[in-house]
Amino acid sequence: MAKMIAFDEEARRGLEKGLNTLADAVKVTLGPKGRNVVLERKWGAPTITNDGVTIAREIELEDPYEKIGAELVKEVAKKTDDVAGDGTTTATVLAQSLVREGLRNVAAGSNPMGIKRGIQAGVEKITAELLSHAKEIETQEQIAATAGISAADEKIGELIAEAMYKVGDGKLNKDGVITVEESNAFGVNLEVTEGMRFDKGYISGYFATDVERGEAVLEDPYILLVSSKISNVKDLLPLLEKVMQSGKPLLIVAEDIEGEALSTLVVNKIRGTFKSVAVKAPGFGDRRKAQLQDIAILTGGQVIAEEVGLSLETADLPMLGTARKVVVTKDDTTIVDGAGSAEQLAGRIKQIRQEIENADSDYDAEKLQERLAKLSGGVAVLQVGAATEVELKERKHRIEDAVRNAKAAAEEGIVAGGGAALLQTASVLDDNLGLEGDEATGVQIVRAALAAPLKQIAHNAGLEPGVVVDKVANLPVGEGLNAATGEYVDLLGAGISDPVKVTRSALQNAASIAALFLTTEAVVADKPEPEAPAMPGADEMGGMGGF
């Protein structure tokens, strides 16, 4: 396919135009008074949303250079969303400000590499300052407030906070497993079931059942646990045939799955003949064996291992574990509601507790503690229902973001929300960090960008951005604008907070993409194919001229 190439200023301006188009559509949603955006669907009713990453995903531009610019900013929004579950719109607004000011200086003759170094230095300093201002989460109410802001619903915030404490046996558990499921009932309900999550994902992306979300979801699957490698499909076939006859999907957890065995599973999944997912077992050596045994007890299965005289060729369905649901991503596997005996599970938990007491080293004790947390914590399931399919998808996505947001708050603490934290750390850049020339210009660009989120929040609330920024910059640290009421308050006291992880991720990702824009000297894009000519005479249909 023929390519188009643009250089220097033309290349950067094309990218910037795409960035601006996307950012202008996304930034109107920022803050409590953010506006909505209507998204047209090919089928069904349009979707109305104010979620930045959802809007960004929908935008496809026609011009090849603008399209690339928009795609780069989508990456900022997606990366921030993946890491922290929120801050996508903030990241987009920051990226737009950094790129606009940066390109203006590059066009005036500044050295892009000098500006890039200045931006990086400024962002590092601000990140350190944000972390030093962070306040640790101490109560369930603080988690509820943070999650409630992200979900735009106080009750959902309270449920998420309750879930984080329930999977921690009454203590805040930032690593606890919380899943969000679709439900036929209206509203949002919380239940805690037996289950666990381990940090190994699917071996091949072809196993994903939902490509957009990158997930493989198995309902009521059989679970095969093997302590060795599986490469020969002949060993696996007898058992596969039995599972296929049962009509259930299959999760395979083994040391490794490769060669013919893997390709057979993938081909059958693609053809729709048989749904399965292959996952590597967590841990190494003896720890791997112990974790496989944990999963076996949780799911009511047996580990197929030569040491106990079991082999794949002789394995039968009663040796397999089962669970209500299994969700596998590229990074981890979540087993919900394993069918194992509660008595055996309690015995296993007791055994691990004794092993912790007798552990020889802190490292061994720590690893045993991780296993204990996975087995005893369970899985909190938030069941989400809504009136329509479209509303259900939007609500589920928002709650998943709020869960990640709450975990981010528990991990690194919170800072004042409403754009105030970024603006009030700007004073540490007053001396340009002792840098000079283009590097000092880079620091000034960061300083100017720190006001951008608050300006946009004020603008969306119908207030004068310049006046609001000037007022908040002169307030004590932690005080700022409550855009919902138009009053200036102690933000943390009023429950208006952001996880510091969200704020710093937004700034770091925006700076990363801005540096990329500023140092771009050429863009290579696919040349648009000419449209096929219309059928001859199509516009000469009798009596229809002029339409």
UniProtKB/Swiss-Prot annotation:
Belongs to the chaperonin (HSP60) family. Its EC number is 5.6.1.7. It comes from Corynebacterium jeikeium (strain K411). Forms a cylinder of 14 subunits composed of two heptameric rings stacked back-to-back. Interacts with the co-chaperonin GroES. This is Chaperonin GroEL 1. It holds the Pfam family Cpn60_TCP1. ATP binds at residues 29-32, 86-90, 418, 482-484, 498. The gene is groEL1. InterPro entries: Chaperonin_Cpn60_CS (IPR018370), Cpn60/GroEL (IPR001844), Cpn60/GroEL/TCP-1 (IPR002423), GroEL-like_apical_dom_sf (IPR027409), GROEL-like_equatorial_sf (IPR027413), TCP-1-like_intermed_sf (IPR027410). PROSITE patterns: CHAPERONINS_CPN60 (PS00296). NCBIfam families: GroEL (TIGR02348), PRK00013.1 (NF000592), PRK12849.1 (NF009487), PRK12850.1 (NF009488), PRK12851.1 (NF009489).
